[in-house]
From Swiss-Prot:
This is NAD-specific glutamate dehydrogenase. Its EC number is 1.4.1.2. It catalyses: L-glutamate + NAD(+) + H2O = 2-oxoglutarate + NH4(+) + NADH + H(+). Allosterically activated by NADP(+). Belongs to the Glu/Leu/Phe/Val dehydrogenases family. Highly divergent. The keyword Ribonucleoprotein does not apply.
Amino acid sequence: MLLCIVLFLIFHILINQAGIVHVLYNASFVASSSRFILFCEELFKATPQYWQWGNSIVQNGDASIASTLYLTMRTFIKHWKYTLLIMINQSISYSCYSTNEASHLLFTNLPKVAPYTLGPLNFECCLLSSHHIRHIVLMFYGANIDHGLTKYELYTVCRPSSDEKLCNKILNSPRLHTHNRYLYLTEVRIVGAFYLIKQVGARMVGLLVHLAFMVLQNLPKLIWPLDLVHVRQKGTCTAHIAYHPLAQKHFPPYFTHFYLNVTIYAVVKNILDNISSSFTLQSNRVRPRPDVAGFDFFHRFDAFEQSLTYGGDTGITSSNEKVALCFEATYTDIFFTVEIIDSTSVDSGAIMLPILVDAYTAVARNFCSVSMVISPLVTLVVYDIYTCSFIGLCTQRRTINCTRILDAISSVGNSHTFLPRYKSPRELTTRQPSGSSVILLIFLLLGFEFFLFSGLVVVEPVNDVGDLVVNDLLVAFIDLALELFVVEGVAEVVGVVFKTVLGFNADVVGFIFRLVLFSFLHHAFNIILGEATLVVGNGNLVFFTSRLFDGRHVQDTVGINVEGDINLWNTTRHWRNTIEGELPEQVVVTGHRTLTFKHLNQHTRLVVSVGGESLRLLGWHSSVTLDEGSHDTTSSFQTKRERSDIKKQQVLELFRRVVTAQNGSLDCGTESNSFIRVDRLAWFLAVEEVRKQLLDLWDTGGTTDKDDFMDLALGELRVTEDLFNRFHSLAEVVTAHVFETGTGDGGVEINTIEERVDFNVSLGRRRKSTLGTFTSGTKTAKGTLVLGHILAVLALEFSGKVVDEAVIEIFTTQVGITSSSLDFEDTFFNGQKRHIEGTTTKIENENIAFTTLLVKTVGNGGTSRFVNDTKDVKTSNGTSILGSLTLRVVEISWDGNDSVVNSSTNEGFSNFLHLDQNHRGNFFRLESLSFTLEFDGDLWLVTSTRGNLEWPVLNIGLSSWVVEFTTDQTLSIEHSVGRVHGNLVLSGITNKTFAVSESNVRWGGTVTLIVGNNFNTIVLPDTDTRISRTEIDTDGSSLDTRHACSKFKNEVDSPPHLTSAFI
C-alpha cells in the first residue's frame, strides 16, 4: 500500500509538472480544490442573477470578463482540482455596462463567500476605468500574503468606482485591516508566472536576466534587431502589438490579452511618469475618446485628466502641443496610440514604446509604417513593475527619437538620466539580422525560458509547497488508501461473498432477516412442513429442511435443523473431524415463560445431555456411534487432572442393536448432593405420557432450589417400530429439558442437547460398518451445530439421501473454563477444518451470525489430540502456539497506591514463551514475544510501573502499551442484547470468553480471580474453592430472549463490583 501511495504521489506531481507550463502560461496558480469549488458554489448561490446573466452573455457572444468568469469557473469545477482562476476581458469592443453590474454583485456578495473559503482569500482587482473591471484575479493561498497596502492606496484603486457606498464598505471591512485578510483590492504587481516566485526568487531571477542582457549587449553579432525609419509626416504614432506566429499556436488567447493588458498598463504608467515630468498639464484642453472602449486611462491617472502640453529643456520651441493617449483592444490586436493634437511647431517626432510581451513579437508602427522588432526576451526582466522604469522619451526636431531597448534596460530604475544614442537619417536603414544570430538568439531564449520555468518548479513559496504536500497527502491517504483499498476493496469482496442479503435496521425492527446468515426463513419452512419438537413424527417431510449446509464429501457434510435457542456456553469439544460449513443461521426466540433461575452468588451446574462417542472395539473408524443418553462429559476418555476424582463406569448394553449407554459421574466432593446423571426412566415411556404425568409446566408461584431442576430424557422404544415406520417415521429420540416455571432469581444453566443414531452395527473388530445403514433401521439424526468445532457424522436415509449431523464432544477439565468459541459479532469468518485450540471451551450460540466486516477476530481454541486408544489418554497437549494448556491465573488487587508487577505466573499449564497472535487485524501494530504474567492490578491494567504511580480509574488508552496475548489470556466482551450478557474483558482486545467462578482460595485448585468489563475491573475478594474436585460454574449466561441481531452498547460506567445484573 505504501508503494502505491508513493507511486500515486509521483504520478500526481508529474501530472502537475507536465501541466505547469500550461498553468504558468495561463497565469494560473495552485489553489485548493475544496476552497475553490466551495467559493464558486457559494458565489453562484449568492448571485443567481449573475449566473443567469452570464448565460445570456455567452449566448449573445460577448466574451467579456463576466462570461470568462462564468465559463472558466464551470470548466475548472468540472475538470480540475487545483487551479487559480484569472478572468480577463478578452473583448472590450462592446459596452461594459453589464460588466459593471456583475462587479457590483460580486463585491456585494463577497463577504458572504469569504467565510466559507477555509482560508484567506486574496482578491486582487485592477480597476483601470471608472465603469469597467478589466481584470479579476481570484487567488487562493494556504497562508496570508500581506501586500502592505494602506487605506489611501485602496481608496485610490476604488475611487473610480461609481458605487461610493460599495467602495466605503470594502475599505471599512474589518477583515481588510487584520492580519488574516480575505479581501485585497490592488493593482497587479507581478506579471504572469513570476507571482509564484516573487517571495523567494524574483529578485534573483531579475538580476540574472539583467546580467545576461548586459552580456548580450557586448556581443557584436547579437545586436537587437531594432530598426527605425525617419519620420516624415506629422500625425499619430501607434504601437501595434500583434501575435507572434509561435504564440498563436501555443498560447491561448485569454492569456495573451491578460499578459498584454497587464504589461501595457505597467509600460504606460512609466510613460506617463516620463511625460508628466516634461509636459505642462492643462485641464481645459482634454479631448476624450469615447468611441474607443479600451484601456481608458483618463480616469485612472491624474496626468490624463488634463491636457498634456509639450515642453521642456530638450530644445523644442513650441509649448502648445497637446498629446492624448488611449488604448484600443480587439480580440487579436492591441493598439497603443499617442496623438499629437496640435503640432504646429513639431516637424517630426516619435515615441518608441517597447511593449514587453512574453514570447511575442512587438511590432511598433509609426505613421511611416516602418516596423520595429523587439525581442521577447525583454519580458524576462519584468520582475517587479514598481521598481522597473525602463521606458524613456527622446525627442529632437526633424529627427527620429529612439534608442535601443538594451540601453533602456541598462538604465532600469533611472529612466530620467539615461542618454539615448541618436541616429542620422542615413543610419535609419533597415538592417536584417543574420540567420546564425537569430538561431543563436532563439536558442538562448529557449534556454532562459527552460531555466526560469525550472526555477519556478523548485523555487516556489514555502506556503504553496506546504499546501501542495498537504493536499497531495490528503488525496493519497484519503482518496487512494482509504477509499480505493479499504472501502472499494472491501466492498468488492463483500459484493462477491454476500450478493443476496435481505436486511432491516436491527435497532428498529429488533432482529434481522437474512436469507443465508439467519435461520428465520429456514425455520419458517420447518413449521410449514411439520417441523416440531416433542412430537412423534417425521420432521423432515421433504428431506431438505436439514440440508442447509451440505459438503462435497460425506465425511464433512452437516445438516442443520435447529429446534430452539439453546446457549451451550462453556461446554467443551474436541478437534477431530471438524466441518467446513460457513455462516449457519441463527434462531430468533421471540419470548419465554417465566423461569426460576439460580442466584448468581451460588454454585451452578453444567447440565449436559450429550451422547458421547463410544470407541467400541478400539477401531480407528468406529463408524457412527449408537444413541447414548449419557451425561458424563468425559465420555470414553479418562480425563485426569490434579486432585480430581473422575469416576467412569461402563454399563452393559441392554440390547446390542438397541441401546448403548454409559453411566458416568463426577465424584469430586462438591457442595451439592447431586451428580450430573442420566435419567433413563423416560426412555421406556412415551413422550405424551411423560408430558402429561410427570411435568408441571404451569405453576409459577413458587421458587425452586438446586434440586428442583428436572432433566428428563424423553423417548420411546424403537425395537419394533423401526420395522414398520420406514419412510414415515423412523425411530427417533426426542430429548427434552424442562424447566419448572416459577418466579425468582435467575441462575444460569447450560444445556447441551445432542441426539445420535446407532449406525455402528459391525460384528467384529473392524473399522467400518458395511450393512447397518441399508437395513432401514435408523433415522436421520438431529443435533446442534457449533461451527468449526464439531464432529461430522454420516447418516444415510433408506432413500439414499445423505444428511450430515453435528455431534459435539465435550471434555471436562479441573476448573475454570477458558473459551475459544466463535460467539462474536461483526466478524467475517471462514470456518475451516482445523484443530480447536482449547481444552475447555464455550459454545455461545448454536448458530453464529456474522454481520459487519472489517473486524478480524480469531476464535481458535485448542484441545488435546483425538487419540485412538481410549483407555490411556491424558489431555496434556495444550492450545498455545508451542503446545500446552490454556490455563492462566491473573490477579488484580483492589487498591492501587503502591502497585507492583509480578512477572511470575501464579499457576500455569502453558509453555514459558509463546508468540502473540494477531487477533484484531494488527490494529495496534504490535507483535511481541511475551510472557504470561500475573498482574497486580492496582494501576488498572498497567503492565509495568516505575515508582509510586497514581492512576485514574477510567484513563485507559488502547495503544501499544496494551499487549494482547494468546488464548492463555482469553478475556473478551460480547455486546449484550436483552438478557444476553457481555463476557468479561481485560482491555477489550480479544474476543474470547473467560469463565469466572467464585470459590475459596485454597491450595490445589485453579481459580481465576479477575472479573472485568470494558473499562472497569471487578474483583471477587471472597472466593470458594475446595480441594481435589472438579466443579464447573457457568456464571456467564442466561436465556436468550432477544438474541436476534440487535447491538447494544456495553455499559462502560458500571460499578466495579459484582451484582446480580451481571449478564
